[in-house]
C-alpha cells in the first residue's frame, strides 16, 4: 500500500531557528526513515525481549518532559529526529517494532545500543559488545527492506516511496567507540574507525540504490564532553570547555573520515543529495553559548548522582534513589550518555537552516 507524493508547506519562524524573519518553507517529503542508535531510538529497544522492557528508557524518569511517560526514548523528551519531523510538518516517527503502528509518514529503525559494525567485526578488533545490545546497522537495513516488501505492490511503487522520503542514517558509530574506551587505547580504536566510516557509507550507498535521493548522515558528538567518559578519565587533559582533548581529537578524526566517505559517495551518485550534519560543532556551540541558551549546567547529568559530573556507573539514572534535576530544560546532559530535549531542540535550531538549504527546500 503506497501513498502519493505531495509537498508539505511548512511554515515556521526562523526567529525560532536562526533569529531571522518568518518564512515559508516547502519540502517535498512524504516520510522520514531513521536509522541509528539510542540517540534516535523512539521505542525499538524496549520492545526487544528479554531485556528491553526492563531498560531504563522504558521506565521513569525517561519521558518526564515529553510526553510525561516513558516512550522508549533515551531522554527526558523529544529527540533530534522528532524536531526534524516537526520542522518538516510530519508526525513523530513510530518505532519499527511497535505493533499495529502507523507507518504512513515513515519509520524509525534506530535501536538503543546499536553499532555501525557487526559484532564479529568488532570482536576481531578486540571490542566486546554487551549481550543486551546486538542490533547493528546491517540489521536495521534488513528491517527496512522487509518493510518495503510488505508495503509496496511493485518495485516502481517502492522506488517512488523511497524517492519522496528523507533518510537519516545515524548518528551511529558512537557505540563502536564507547564500548571500547574503558579497555582499549585510542590508537587501537583509531585503527578500526575507517571500518565504521565504510559501514555507514555502504549503508548510504544501499539506500541510494533502493532509490533514496535525500540523505542526512550526521557525524559524532564530542566523545570528550560526555559525563560517562569524563567519569572514566578524571585526570585527562581538558580544554577550555572542560572536555577531554584526546577524546575530542578522536571525534574529529572520526568525523573527518565520515566526510571523506560522503564526498566519495557524492561523486559516485551525483543524483543524490547527501548532507553531512555537523553534530560535533553544534554541540560545542551549545556548550560555548550555554548561558545565552538558558542552560545552567553543561557537563553535569540532569538524572544521576555523585562526583563532579553527577554521574556514577554503579548508580545510573533510573536506579532506586538516583534523583532527577528539578528543571531538565536547564541541562544539556540527561543521564551521562544522552542529552536532554532542550539540547536536542537547540541542536536542530543550529543545524536546520543549512540542512533545508542543502535539501533544496524553497
Swiss-Prot record:
Confined to roots. Acetylesterase involved in the biosynthesis of ajmaline-type monoterpenoid indole alkaloids (MIAs) natural products, important plant-derived pharmaceuticals used in the therapy of heart disorders. Deacetylates 17-O-acetylnorajmaline to produce norajmaline. May also catalyze the conversion of 17-O-acetylajmaline to ajmaline. Its EC number is 3.1.1.80. It comes from Rauvolfia serpentina. Residues 1-23 form the signal peptide. Glycans are attached at residues 100, 118, 151, 202. The keyword NADP does not apply. This is Acetylajmalan esterase 2. Pathway: Alkaloid biosynthesis; ajmaline biosynthesis. The gene is AAE2. It is an enzyme of class 3 (hydrolase). The active site is at residues 38, 335, 338. Belongs to the 'GDSL' lipolytic enzyme family. Keywords: Alkaloid metabolism, Glycoprotein, Hydrolase, Signal. The strictosidine aglycone-producing AJM7-DeltaHYS yeast strain expressing pathway genes of the VOM module, RsGS, SBE (GsSBE, RsSBE1 or RsSBE2), RsPNAE, RsVS and RsVH, accumulates vomilenine. Additionnal expression of pathway genes of the AJM module, RsVR, RsDHVR, AAE (RsAAE1 or RsAAE2) and RsNNMT, leads to the production of ajmaline. Ajmaline is an anti-arrhythmic alkaloid commercially used as an efficient drug for the treatment of arrhythmic heart disorder. It catalyses: 17-O-acetylnorajmaline + H2O = norajmaline + acetate + H(+); 17-O-acetylajmaline + H2O = ajmaline + acetate + H(+).
Amino acid at each position: 500500500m503506497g501513498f502519493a507524493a505531495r509537498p508539505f508547506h511548512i511554515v515556521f519562524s526562523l526567529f525560532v531557528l536562526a533569529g531571522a524573519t518568518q518564512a515559508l518553507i516547502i519540502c517535498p517529503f512524504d516520510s522520514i526513515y531513521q536509522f541509528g542508535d539510542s540517540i534516535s531510538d523512539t521505542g525499538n529497544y524496549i520492545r526487544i525481549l528479554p531485556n528491553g522492557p526492563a531498560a531504563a528508557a522504558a521506565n521513569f524518569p525517561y519521558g518526564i518532559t515529553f510526553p510525561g511517560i516513558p516512550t522508549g526514548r533515551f531522554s527526558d523528551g523529544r529527540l533530534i529526529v522528532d524536531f526534524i519531523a516537526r520542522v518538516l510538518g510530519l508526525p513523530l516517527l513510530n518505532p519499527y517494532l511497535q505493533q499495529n503502528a502507523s507507518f504512513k509518514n515513515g519509520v524509525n529503525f534506530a535501536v538503543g545500543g546499536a553499532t555501525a559494525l557487526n559484532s564479529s567485526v568488532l570482536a576481531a578488533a578486540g571490542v566486546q559488545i554487551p549481550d543486551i545490545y546486538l542490533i547493528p546497522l546491517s540489521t536495521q537495513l534488513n528491517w527496512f527492506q522487509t518493510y518495503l516488501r510488505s508495503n509496496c505492490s511493485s518495485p516502481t511503487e517502492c522506488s517512488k516511496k523511497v524517492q519522496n522520503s528523507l533518510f537519516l542514517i545515524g548518528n551511529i558509530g558512537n557505540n563502536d567507540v564507547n564500548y571500547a574506551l574503558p579497555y582499549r587505547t585510542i590508537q587501537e580504536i583509531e585503527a578500526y574507525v575507517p571500518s565504521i566510516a565504510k559501514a555507514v557509507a555502504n549503508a548510504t550507498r544501499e539506500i541510494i540504490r533502493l532509490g533514496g535521493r535525500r540523505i542526512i548522515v550526521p557525524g559524532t558528538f564530542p566523545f570528550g564532553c560526555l559525563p560517562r567518559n569524563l567519569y572514566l578519565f578524571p585526570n585527562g587533559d581538558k580544554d577550555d570547555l572542560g572536555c577531554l582533548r584526546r577524546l575530542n581529537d578522536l571525534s574529529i578524526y572520526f568525523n573527518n573520515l565520515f566526510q571523506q566517505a560522503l564526498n566519495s559517495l557524492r561523486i559516485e551518485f551525483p543524483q543524490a543529495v547527501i548532507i553531512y550534519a555537523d553534530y560535533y560543532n553544534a554541540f560545542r556551540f551549545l556548550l560555548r553559548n550555554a548561558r545565552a541558551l538558558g542552560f545552567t549546567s553543561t557537563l553535569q547529568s540532569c538524572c544521576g548522582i555523585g562526583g563532579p559530573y553527577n554521574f556514577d556507573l554503579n548508580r545510573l539514572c533510573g536506579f532506586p534513589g538516583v534523583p532527577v534535576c528539578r528543571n531538565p530544560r536547564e541541562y544539556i546532559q540527561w543521564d551521562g550518555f544522552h542529552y536532554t530535549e532542550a539540547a536536542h531542540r537547540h541542536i536542530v535550531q543550529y543545524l536546520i537552516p543549512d540542512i533545508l538549504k542543502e535539501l533544496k527546500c524553497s
